[in-house]
Structures are given as C-alpha cells and as structure tokens.
Amino acid sequence: MMFGKKIIHSKTIWFYFLLFLFSIFTNMGLGNVLSENIPVSDYAILFVITAISFYFTPWLGRILITVLFLSALFYCSAGFFYGIPSLGIIASVYETNINETLEYYTTIPFWIFLFQASYFILFVALMKLSFHVKQQAFKWLNTAVISLLLVFSYNQFSDWNYGYKFRFYPVLFYSEFDRMNDLYLEQRDFLNQSANAPSQWDIQSFMPKYKNYILIIGESMRKDYMSLYGFPLKTTPFLERVKGTVFENYYSAAPNTQPSLQLTLYRAEKGETVYTDNIISLAKKAGVKTYWISNQGKIGEFDTIASRIGQSADETIFMKPLGYNSKKVYDDEMLPVLDKALKENISNSKLIVIHLIGSHPAFCERLPYEVKNYFINQSMSCYLESIKYTDQFLEKLNSQLVAQNEPYSVIYFSDHGLAHYEDSNGLSLHPNNLYKQDYEIPFIMFSSDSQKVEKIKTPQSAFNFVYGFADWMGIKEKHLQGVDFFHPEKQEIKVFDWNNVVNVKELADDPAKLPETVQ
C-alpha cells in the first residue's frame, strides 16, 4: 500500500515539474523571450493559472494546456524573433500566400524545429501524467504552491491598472493579438472604402519634365551590402557609374513591406494616413497614365497595401495573379511588360511603378541561376548575388528607356533592410525591427538628362517621400508644401518599429560583414 502511494507521489511531483517546464516553453513560444530581464514570475504566473485549472477539474486543465500548446507551437517561429504580436506580424498572417508561407518555412532555423519537437514531447508526457494524478493530489499541492507563487507573481497583477500593456502572460499575448488584429482589420476596411472614394488632392499646377517616369520599389536591400555605398565586393557596378542623384543616408519608414509602403506611398495628415491620397491617385489626378507592374503577387481577398494601390492604376499587371503560383517568376520577366507599356502611344506622360521581388528571403530562390559560395556561406552569397541581379535589372531597364528615345526619369529605393541572424546553416538575414540597418536603404534617381553624380549626405526619411514624388513628377499640390525632399534640412530621423515611432539613433548597430580579404 505504501509502495502504491509512493508511486502516486512520484507521479504527482513529476507532473508539477513538467507543468512548470511547460509554462517556460509556452512563454517562450508566445514571444516572451526577447526581454533582457525576464523574472521568474513571468513563468510562474502561467504555472499558477494551469495549476488552478487542474485544481478545479483535470479536464479544464487539459483543455487549457491544449489551447496554450497549440498557440505557442504555431507562433514560436515568429515569437522567438519578434516577440509579442505586432501590426507587422498580423499583416503578414493575412497577406502571405501559400507559396510565400512555404518559402518562409525554409528560412526557419533548425533549432526552432527542435524546440517544437521537444515541446510536443513535453505536452504529450504532461497529458499522460495528468490522468494518473488524483484530484486530491492537485488540491494539497496547489494550496502550498499557489500560495508561494502568488507572492512572486504580485508584480504581474500590480500592472493591471495601466491598460492593455500589463505584463501578465499569457493574457498579454492574446490581448495584443486581438488588439492588433482589430487594428489591422480597421486599416484594411479603410483601404477598401477608400478604393472608390474621391481623393483629397488639390493640384495647383502640373509641369512634367519627362515623358516616362519609372518608380522601382525594391525589396529587402540593405545599402551597406551595395558597392555603391562602399561595400568592397562589386555588387552594383551599373549604379556606381550611372549619373544621377544618390541619397547617402536614406531611411525606410518601417522594417517590413506592409507598414513601410503604407507610410511611404500614402499622404499623412496629423500622423494619420489619408487612405484616398497615394502616389497613384495623385498621378491620375494630374492626368498621367499610370501602370503598376508587380512581381510581389496579388494576394486576393487579403491583398497587400501595395497591391491595393496597384489595382487603382490605369493598367495593372501582376506576375503572380491571385498571389498563389508555385512557379517561380524572376524580376527580369517584367522587362517585356515594361517594354509594352513604354511603346503604348499616348500623348500624356506615363508613371510606371515596378515592384520587385528583389532580395526577399529566401535569397537563392530570387535568382534564375545557381550561385557559388563565395561570401561566408550560400545564403549570404545569394544575398549579394540578388543585389547584383537587381543592379543588372536596372541596367537593362535603362537600356530599354534609352532605346525608346523619350525623356525619362527613374527612382529606385528599397522598402526596408534586413538584420543578421544565425540558423543551422550559419549566418543569414531576415526582417527585424531592432537595428539601424533594418531601415538604412538605397535611394537613387537617374534621368535621361543627368550630367553628373550628386550625392546628398543630409539624412532623409521615407515619411517624406510623397513630397519628393510630387516634386519629381512636376506636380504642385496644396497639401504637399513646406518639404524640399531633394534638398533636405537637418532633421531627426524617426522610424516606425511595428509598435512605436522611435529615433533611429537609439537603435542598435548591425553592420555588414566584410570579406576576409579586407578585415
């Protein structure tokens, strides 16, 4: 009889030990891992909640840990890198198609899968043990454990009066997920409503200098891996020799595509986006024929900020219709589409926006040829090669414009940068919000009448791009006064880090890696 009680006692101890391990794994999977100083109570409070649920009825406990397990299992690949849910993460959930999702999983470090496997084994063991622990055991141990842990967890509850941002995990995860989801849906509804609404643009004059205006939106290109900006390997030979204007200190508005392009391509008023007023609606208001050529995909019901603007253009060409196409489409395949747009015989000026897939992870998938490992590893070699490929694309595009024999001007910028991280294959890059280099991007303008290279050293922000766009197009508009984009004044550069607008100087540094020959 005593032997049987010892077995029950042993199983009870093991159950609570595994339950505490489960609370640690769950907190980590739900994004509570990025803090520099995570108190024990962050893990203990979840242990308290689950223990209480088993105290009332084991079935309630099993349901609770199952919900927590599934949430953390599926979120951990984002949670380890980005923390609690943000607007950028929610937008990615809605706006990522199946092909992009599969590509995303190929970039996940192997240790994430090891974590998921360990977490799954822990969950199964915990569930099995829960059927062998008597409810009386739950009661006597809960009384002692919960009393002790509530003391350690007091600081969690003390934050409740400060709104949604109390640090009570996992409630914080679900409350933030719900809040960000509502915010995203609200913004999406605004965009849908504004699609057919009249713009607020008030154009005072329009004096175009060129026949063809080409705006090229790049993807995930850090400027410090471009030889144009001093990287020792030749990654941008065309951009280095073309005459035009180069911003040496240009910053994206945000660290990933959706918020970055929203803050770049739309007009803002008192810090709020005016969803009817974007670069396409401005050009159309001026009588310019507009084209949108995209290799990013038209996602369908939950299409991106960029594709919504694109669909409002006079001519819209998505290389990946409806956003799901397993066939790889390379950026070069847009050049024949561009040629057709250039040859369309109209009297008005044209605005042709080209949205590249560029250097989007996974980098090797963006290239129509195999890449030898010549810089650190395969991933980093492909990243450099994707920059070369974009440079070659720009050179071919310029040749097409020259052959057209019409005045033209081209602007190229990237939507955001990337940050270094380590995976099972070594060093690579992915979107992040913690470093200056997540926002430090190239901006180049070259035209048919450019005579020299002009370098602008004064920092400029993509928050001001719409002012520069109007100036570039020769449009004088009532709301776009007071900012001389191409002759910037000294200013503090702010960026949106998914949660707040912060000074870029306050961010950490993540410099480019150099070849061994120049280290």
Curated annotation (Swiss-Prot):
Pfam families: Sulfatase. This is Putative phosphoethanolamine transferase HI_1005. Coiled coil: none annotated. It is found in: Cell membrane. CDD domains: LptA. One of its GO terms (biological process) is lipopolysaccharide core region biosynthetic process. Belongs to the phosphoethanolamine transferase family. Its EC number is 2.7.-.-. The chain crosses the membrane at residues 13-33, 40-60, 63-83, 107-127, 137-157. It comes from the Bacteria. It comes from Haemophilus influenzae (strain ATCC 51907 / DSM 11121 / KW20 / Rd). One of its GO terms (cellular component) is plasma membrane. InterPro entries: Alkaline_phosphatase_core_sf (IPR017850), PEA_transferase (IPR040423), Sulfatase_N (IPR000917). One of its GO terms (molecular function) is phosphotransferase activity, phosphate group as acceptor. It is a multi-pass membrane protein. Keywords: Cell membrane, Membrane, Transferase, Transmembrane, Transmembrane helix.
